[in-house]
Structure formats: C-alpha cells, structure tokens
Amino acid sequence: MEPTRLVRPFEVVSEYQPSGDQPKAIAELAGRITAGETDVVLLGATGTGKSATTAWLVEAVQRPTLVLAHNKTLAAQLANEFRELLPNNAVEYFVSYYDYYQPEAYVPQTDTFIEKDSSINAEVERLRHSTTNSLLSRRDVVVVSTVSCIYGLGAAEEYLEAMVALQVGQNVGRDQLIRRFVAMQYERNDIDFSRGKFRVRGDTIEIIPVYEEHALRIELFGDEIEALYSLHPLTGEVLARTDAVSVFPATHYAASPATIQRAIGTIQTELHDRLVELEREGKLLEAQRLRMRTQFDIEMMEQIGFCSGIENYSRHIDGRAPGEAPHCLLDYFPDDFLVVIDESHVTVPQIGAMYEGDASRKRTLVEHGFRLPSAMDNRPLRWNEFKERVGQTVYLSATPGQYELGIADGVVEQIIRPTGLVDPQILVKPTKGQIDDLLEEIRARAERDERVLVTTLTKKMAEELTDFLAEAGVKVRYLHADVDTLRRVELLTELRSGVFDVLVGINLLREGLDLPEVSLVAILDADKEGFLRSSTSLIQTIGRAARNVSGEVHMYADVLTDSMKKAIEETSRRSELQVEYNRANGIDPQPLRKRIADITDILAREEADTAKILAGRDQKRKSPTPSLRSGGIAAQGAAELESLIADLNAQMLAAAGELKFELAARLRDELSDLKRDLRQMEKAGHLS
C-alpha cells in the first residue's frame, strides 16, 4: 500500500544568498540531477559551504533527500545546519539509538557466551520513529543519517498497515482502539504516562506516540470519535484541536497476528531441519541449546506477538528468501529520493565494510547453536544492495575517492569560498631543528591570539612533544584516541576560546572540523608515506588552516614525496583560482566568524545541567539557582528574568516527569518568587 504523503515545497530560509562558487555549483548539480545523471561528485574545498549548497540543491530539485555522514557527531552538526536552513520542512536525524551496545556473541576458545546488553537513548529512539513517521506522511523530508540506515528495520508495508488512522466522526469502539494500540506494542499504564504508553479514563483514551513529545487525547461518545486534542503530557493543557491524526506503531518491527503465525510456522520448519543437521554432525549440545532458545522465543511470539531479539527472525516475518536483503530505512523513502553522501572518501568505504563485520560474529553464533541460520539475514546491506536501492547520488568531499571519481558522470567543483578566504600557504621545512622552529612559530601565533594544530605520526612522539612544549611555557593539550567524543568537543572549544594555544594529536584531520582561530597547522614527518600522510589525509589536514585569513601549513620533511607533491599542487591550484576570483570581483577576504558552539557541546552541557538539577542531592540548597539571584533582582534585566522563569518552568516539569516531586516543589516556590519580582518590576515601570 503506497502511503498518501503531504506535499509541501522545500524552502531555504537564510539571511545569506549563494555566493562564491555556490551559485554555479547549485545550478550545475541541479542540471545534472534533472538530466538524469546517476552519480555526481561535488569536489568542494574546505569551508566553501557544501552543506548550504546541499540545502539549496534540495530546494532546486524538490525531492526527499537522504544525507549520509560517517559518524554521529558530524550527522548531528549537519542536522542542525539543515534545520536552520530549512525551518519549514521536516529535517530528521536517524542514527543508532544505543548509548551503549554489546552485541550477542560467543567466544569458542573460552566457551563464553556474551548476552546482548544495551542502553537505549530514548530521545534518539524518538527521533528514529519521527523519521519513519515523516517519510510515510510527507514529501518535504531531509533525513541526516549514519550507516544505521542500511541496517535491518521492519518492513515499511507492515509498519504502514499497522498504523491507526483516526478522524472526528469515525465509528470505532473504545475496546477496539485499546486492542489496536496493544497490538502496536503500546503499553497501557494509567499511572506512569510517558512515551509509548496510553491510559484510559471512561470514554477518553490518551496516548503518547513514540515519535511525539505531546500526547493525543481521543474523546469518544459511544462508538464514535467526538474530538481529538493535542495536549501537554504532564500538565494536561490542551495545545490544539485536530480533525484527523494517524498513530504509527511503537516498534519498527510491527507485524499483524496473521504474519506472526505464518512466521512461527516457517521458524519451526527451519528449526526442525537445523536440529536434524546438528544431530547428524554429532553436535548434541548445540542442538539442545538451539531447541530451548528457539522454542522459548516461539512461545513468546504466540502469547504476545513479540519476543526479545525478534529482529533475528526478521527473514521469516518479512517472508524473505534465504540471502535476500533485509528491509531498511531506504524502503521508507519515495521512489524518487535523492542521496547525498558527505565526506564520501570516508563514508563510501564505511558502508561497504559493515556487512562482513556483522556476518563474522553471527556465523559463530549459528555454528554453536545460539541462533538459527536465518539470523544471518538480519544484517546490514551489502554495497551492491545499497546501490540497487538508491537512485541518484551526489558525493561530497574535498578529496573524493577513486570509486566516486570512477563512476561519476561528472565532477562539479566548488573552490571559491563565500568569505573570499584562500587556501593556506604551504611551506616545506627541513626536519633538522624542526622543534625549535615550531616553538618559535607557536610563540609568534600566541602573541597574535591565534591557535596552532600540530600533527605527529606516533602517540609517543605526540606525548613527548606535548611535555616539551609545556615545559617551554606553551599552553598546550594533547588529543588522543582515549579521549571520548564529548571531551574532544570540550578540548576543541577550549582551543577556540584561548584556554590553550596549541593542540597536538596524531590524526587531527577530522573531516568537518571547523576551527577558524587556527592560523598554523604543523605537520611533522610529512615525508613518511602511509595512511596519515597520504595525499587525501594531507589535503584534509591542510584544510584545517583554510578558515583563517593568515592560515599557513608547515610541512617538516627532508624529501618531497608523491603525496606531498599532489597535496601541494592541488592546494596551489585552488589558491590560484581563489585569488584570481577575488581580484576580478574586488573581494577582500574576511575571517570566518563562527559561534564557539557545537551541537554536541550544547547537548553535553544541557545533559550535564539537567542531571545536576534532577539529582537534587544537595539538600542544603534553599534554592536550586542561588547564583542566578545572588546579585539581587536589580541585577537581573527583564528579558533575563523572563528567560530564567521559562527555564525554571521547564526544569520543574522535567523534575515532575522524573517523579522528583520535592525538587519540583522547590522549583515551583522559586518560580513563584521570580514571578512576584517580575510583577513588581512592571509596577515600578522598569518594563516597556
């Protein structure tokens, strides 16, 4: 069944207009896509605004779009940018919802079985459901995703078939609705009303869909829907009235009772065949293990239509043939969707590598009787299967890989930056006396309040260099593999803010990293050929200095390698084009002004603040916000006071939602005092 999707145009809302190479790139990309070219490469230099170009391209072609990034942090950054550029359209974020994930595994050498263990991030899970909801209900959708989009997901047809469409005046019984919601894996809970649950009070049913922040109230009169309301789940405040709404399942692995019964039949057939095979091979322990585990899962499915690890039976539930590719997020898109692969030189190999890593683990589980062979078909797509499911693809990169360049119908260049900034000057210096030279360059930059990145080849060298620079009085930090993602964000923010001047690391290229304050990138051992000193890595590293007007790259080397030569020639070519464009158009290069903030930084800060507030461990605090009021009410402007009231109100509701009622009461009292102060300011005429 093909869903009916709301049609609304994509519209970019921005105070800026395309500039530099952007207008030409947008027009050429749109022209090639419209002409039907299957694969197109956008070779965009660092800092030329490839994300903005993508948004304008989507506006030009008016097609649902999947944007692929190679890690969660970059995906979050891209989603944030697209939401700012396309505020009136659905920009969704689809990544793995696990904060922690230990997959099911077996180690034959030690006879150790590791149970699946995971911690699910409820908010990311909501965003995943929001993605599928948007894809099946509207066309103006941009989904920013990682490789999660190629992993198994329930069939779109089953998901859509399980949906409940509600309309005012519709004839439907209360008990019938309750049964439908339970079949969709919603839990009835009249006490703890939260996402994925519903409650019943007389002829009124209230439900919070897994993809929504607000609740839905269904008021019935007999067997007829009398009214539908959107309401705040905690306060019960009615936010809006609607005439029609659709409720999608609480799980992507939705299946009708008939489908489950059919699947149970084929699972039992496969189990019988596999047991015969194992017993014939003399693997009696494995056979008994498989019989017990599978029979338990079958009983669970017979009783409640679901079982833990049901995704391992997805081939049976979907009715797929052995070896057939699983359903995934790509199946939820309309047929004419566009794919944009960001940092394609990294993301393309990543997509291709996912299948084999998953298969090797499951192969061991199957061989030792922990899973049926059909569990192998709950897997990510192979590369060729991915290509079959996507249509036209745009590959974005400052350094496109051989694969993209080989299959592309054409390469579109975006070299000129909107800011007029040119690629950095590259100097090759001898290794003799390199540390003294580097120290001198660092001190010169520090005096100008500029920052420096230093990249080395080994962990030991990075540590020793950091110690040496620190002893020489340089404010320096060392970024290494053991630093977690959020701490890495903090380090980069501290670098930009001037807490320290130099960051030393091994692999600092970090595609998509924006550091406008960095005016010098020093590459030690630049002539040591290898992954970290390939032409691609060198160009990416050089790009870290391309966001500063006085950016320079110093390569310390005694030999000019082929990789160095390619990187220098490509950078020089781009620089010449940029300088010529600036001269012809009278453009004076402007420094890139970017807020010292990042979506992961913001999320981390909010998460820490919320945890601190909700913990409520310091019982001695009379007010949870003494520092905000320590200067007296006169120290607070009206706007700040109103903002504080809004923040505290949100914290109070969050505390109540977490059942932290004592904290919520303290916040309520604090709110009451602040509102009284605000009223006094109004009476005194301090508010306009």
Swiss-Prot record:
It comes from the Bacteria. GO terms for biological process: nucleotide-excision repair; SOS response. InterPro entries: Helicase/UvrB_N (IPR006935), Helicase_ATP-bd (IPR014001), Helicase_C-like (IPR001650), P-loop_NTPase (IPR027417), UVR_dom (IPR001943), UVR_dom_sf (IPR036876), UvrB (IPR004807), UvrB_inter (IPR041471). It is found in: Cytoplasm. CDD domains: DEXHc_UvrB (cd17916), SF2_C_UvrB (cd18790). Residues 31-414 form the Helicase ATP-binding domain. Pfam families: Helicase_C (PF00271), ResIII (PF04851), UVR (PF02151), UvrB (PF12344), UvrB_inter (PF17757). Disulfide bonds: none annotated. Coiled coil: none annotated. GO terms for molecular function: ATP binding; ATP hydrolysis activity; DNA binding; excinuclease ABC activity. Residues 434-600 form the Helicase C-terminal domain. Keywords: ATP-binding, Cytoplasm, DNA damage, DNA excision, DNA repair, Excision nuclease, Nucleotide-binding, SOS response. Its main location: cytoplasm. ATP binds at residues 44-51. Residues 614-633 are annotated as: Disordered. The keyword DNA damage applies. Residues 642-677 form the UVR domain. GO terms for cellular component: cytoplasm; excinuclease repair complex. A motif (Beta-hairpin) lies at residues 97-120. Belongs to the UvrB family. The UvrABC repair system catalyzes the recognition and processing of DNA lesions. A damage recognition complex composed of 2 UvrA and 2 UvrB subunits scans DNA for abnormalities. Upon binding of the UvrA(2)B(2) complex to a putative damaged site, the DNA wraps around one UvrB monomer. DNA wrap is dependent on ATP binding by UvrB and probably causes local melting of the DNA helix, facilitating insertion of UvrB beta-hairpin between the DNA strands. Then UvrB probes one DNA strand for the presence of a lesion. Forms a heterotetramer with UvrA during the search for lesions. Interacts with UvrC in an incision complex. The beta-hairpin motif is involved in DNA binding. HAMAP family: UvrB. This is UvrABC system protein B. The lineage of its organism: Bacteria, Bacillati, Actinomycetota, Actinomycetes, Micrococcales. The gene is uvrB.
